[in-house]
C-alpha cells in the first residue's frame, strides 16, 4: 500500500464503541463519543480505555499487527477474508477440583489470556503469583485491568499511521521506519519457565585461563560445581529477592539468560504496571511498555496522544504539542499567542476558564478572572479588593488584616461575629 493510499485510509474509527458507558463517570456520561482528533470521549473527556467498549477483535488485530514481520509471527494468524493478522492469544480454561458427588456442576475458570506454555500447571502457578485483582479471569476486575492496559500500553496510533490524525506523506514514512526499528531492536515477549531451565539453556560463560587437555578433569569438576551453584541461587532482576527453584520465572530474550523476573515483577520501569500479555520493550537494561518505550524515543503530543514526527512542534508546560493541537481543552480553539490557564494539566482559554472553571467570589458572587488577585481560605475565595473582601457585618476592608472565617463569611472581630450569629 503506497503512502497516498494510507493517508486516504486514515481515520480514528468514530463509530467504534459509540454510546458505551463510562466506567469512571457512570451515569454522568451520556455514552462514548470519540473526539474528532483527541483520543477521548467528547462527553466526559475520559479516555477510550475508561469506557466499557467491546474491543476483543480490534485489540487482537492491533497486537497481530505489532507481531507481523517479527520472530513472534507464530503468535498471529492471518484471516483468509482480508489477510489482516490476528493475535492468537492463549485462552486457558481450568477445571477446579471438586469432590466426586452426583448432581454437582463442574467449576471452571476461564482466563482471557494465559502464558502460551505446554505445562498447564506452570501456567496456573504463574496466574496465582499475580495480584488477584490483576488476574485476567473472564468477567472480573482483572480482565478489565488487562483490557485497560492493552489500550494504554500498546496504543494503535503508536504503530499504525491510519490510526493517526492527518499525517503528511513524510510523517507516514518516518513513522513506518520508526516502527520497523523498534520491532527489530526492542520488541519482545516474555517466556515462562522454571529458573533452572533458563539458566541451563544459557551459554556457558566460564573461562579457565591456560587450560589444556591435561586440565579437562579439573575443568569438568569446576563446571559441575558452577552448574550446581547456578541451580540453587536465583534472584529477581527487579526486586532482587531470591526466587524459588520450583516457582515460575519470566525470561526476556533481549535481556539475556542471566536475568529473571517474578511474574508480579515483570513490569514497565516507568509506570510499574504489569506488562500486558508479557509484551515488553528492552532498552538500556530496562523493561518498558510500548507507550513508555516510544516516549523515550519520540516526543508525544499532549493533545492527540500521538507521537510527533514533525520537526516543528510546541513545548509548553513541560509537555509537547503538535502546532495545530495546542488548543483549549474545552472549546478546541488554538491557543498560540492567547492567554490560557492550566486546569488538571490541560490548557484552557480564558473565556472557557471563566465560564467553566473559575471560582466564585464570596463577596460579589461573580467568577474571579484568572489574572486578578484573590484571597483564598479553605474552599472559599474573594476578589482581593476593597469591594469584596470585607467584614460580613460592618463591611470593613480586611485586606492585610486579621479575620475570623465562619462558613463562608469573614469577620473583623468577635463583636461583629456575635452580632451576625
From Swiss-Prot:
It holds the Pfam family LIM. SUPFAM superfamilies: Glucocorticoid receptor-like (DNA-binding domain). Gene3D superfamilies: Cysteine Rich Protein. One of its GO terms (molecular function) is zinc ion binding. Its main location: cytoplasm. InterPro entries: LIM1_Testin, LIM2_Testin, LIM3_Testin, PET_domain, PET_testin, Pk/Esn/Tes, Znf_LIM. It comes from the Eukaryota. Residues 234-297, 299-359, 362-421 form the LIM zinc-binding domain. It is found in: Cytoplasm; Cell junction, Focal adhesion. SMART domains: LIM (SM00132). PROSITE patterns: LIM_DOMAIN_1 (PS00478), LIM_DOMAIN_2 (PS50023), PET (PS51303). Keywords: Cell junction, Cytoplasm, LIM domain, Metal-binding, Repeat, Zinc. Residues 92-199 form the PET domain. One of its GO terms (biological process) is negative regulation of cell population proliferation. One of its GO terms (cellular component) is focal adhesion. Belongs to the prickle / espinas / testin family. Scaffold protein that may play a role in cell adhesion, cell spreading and in the reorganization of the actin cytoskeleton. Plays a role in the regulation of cell proliferation. May act as a tumor suppressor. Interacts via LIM domain 1 with ZYX. Interacts (via LIM domain 3) with ENAH and VASP. Interacts with ALKBH4, talin, actin, alpha-actinin, GRIP1 and PXN. Interacts (via LIM domain 2) with ACTL7A (via N-terminus). Heterodimer with ACTL7A; the heterodimer interacts with ENAH to form a heterotrimer. The N-terminal and the C-terminal halves of the protein can associate with each other, thereby hindering interactions with ZYX. This is Testin. It comes from Otolemur garnettii.
Amino acid at each position: 500500500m503506497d503512502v497516498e493510499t494510507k493517508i486516504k485510509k486514515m481515520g480514528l474509527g468514530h463509530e467504534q464503541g459509540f454510546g458505551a458507558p463510562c466506567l469512571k463517570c457512570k451515569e454522568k456520561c451520556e455514552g462514548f463519543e470519540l473526539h474528532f482528533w483527541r483520543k477521548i470521549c467528547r462527553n466526559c473527556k475520559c479516555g477510550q480505555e475508561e469506557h466499557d467498549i467491546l474491543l476483543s477483535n480490534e485489540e487482537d488485530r492491533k497486537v497481530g499487527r505489532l507481531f507481523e514481520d517479527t520472530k513472534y509471527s507464530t503468535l498471529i494468524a492471518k484471516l483468509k477474508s482480508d489477510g489482516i493478522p490476528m493475535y492468537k492469544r492463549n485462552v486457558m480454561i481450568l477445571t477446579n477440583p471438586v469432590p466426586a458427588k452426583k448432581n454437582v456442576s463442574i467449576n471452571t475458570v476461564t482466563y482471557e489470556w494465559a502464558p502460551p506454555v505446554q505445562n498447564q500447571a506452570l501456567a496456573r502457578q504463574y496466574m496465582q503469583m499475580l495480584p488477584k485483582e490483576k488476574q485476567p479471569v473472564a468477567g472480573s476486575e482483572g480482565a478489565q485491568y488487562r483490557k485497560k492496559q492493552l489500550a494504554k500500553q500498546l496504543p494503535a496510533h503508536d504503530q499504525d499511521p491510519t490510526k493517526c490524525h492527518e499525517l503528511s506523506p513524510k510523517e507516514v514514512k518516518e513513522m513506518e521506519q520508526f516502527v520497523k526499528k523498534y520491532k527489530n531492536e526492542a520488541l519482545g515477549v516474555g517466556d515462562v519457565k522454571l529458573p533452572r531451565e533458563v539458566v541451563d539453556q544459557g551459554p556457558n560463560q566460564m573461562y579457565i585461563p591456560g587450560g589444556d587437555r591435561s586440565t579437562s578433569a579439573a575443568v569438568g569438576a569446576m563446571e559441575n560445581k558452577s552448574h550446581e551453584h547456578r541451580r540453587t541461587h536465583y534472584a529477581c532482576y527487579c526486586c532482587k529477592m531470591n526466587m524459588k527453584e520450583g516457582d515460575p520465572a519470566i525470561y526476556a530474550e533481549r535481556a539475556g539468560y542471566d536475568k529473571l523476573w517474578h511474574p508480579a515483577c515483570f513490569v514497565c520501569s516507568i509506570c510499574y504496571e504489569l506488562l500486558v500479555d508479557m509484551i515488553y520493550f528492552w532498552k538500556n537494561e530496562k523493561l518498558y511498555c510500548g507507550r513508555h518505550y516510544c516516549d523515550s524515543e519520540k516526543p508525544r503530543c499532549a493533545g492527540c496522544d500521538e507521537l510527533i514526527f514533525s520537526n516543528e512542534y510546541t513545548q509548553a508546560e513541560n509537555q509537547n504539542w503538535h502546532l495545530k493541537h495546542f488548543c483549549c481543552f474545552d472549546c478546541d480553539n488554538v491557543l498560540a499567542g492567547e492567554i490560557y490557564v492550566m486546569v488538571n494539566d490541560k490548557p484552557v482559554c480564558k473565556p472557557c476558564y471563566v465560564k467553566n472553571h473559575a471560582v466564585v467570589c464570596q463577596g460579589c458572587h461573580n467568577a474571579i478572572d484568572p489574572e486578578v488577585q484573590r484571597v483564598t481560605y479553605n474552599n472559599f475565595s474573594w476578589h482581593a479588593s476593597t469591594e469584596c473582601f470585607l467584614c460580613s457585618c460592618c463591611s470593613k476592608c480586611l485586606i492585610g488584616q486579621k479575620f475570623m472565617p465562619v462558613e463562608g463569611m469573614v469577620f473583623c472581630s468577635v463583636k461583629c461575629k456575635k452580632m451576625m450569629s
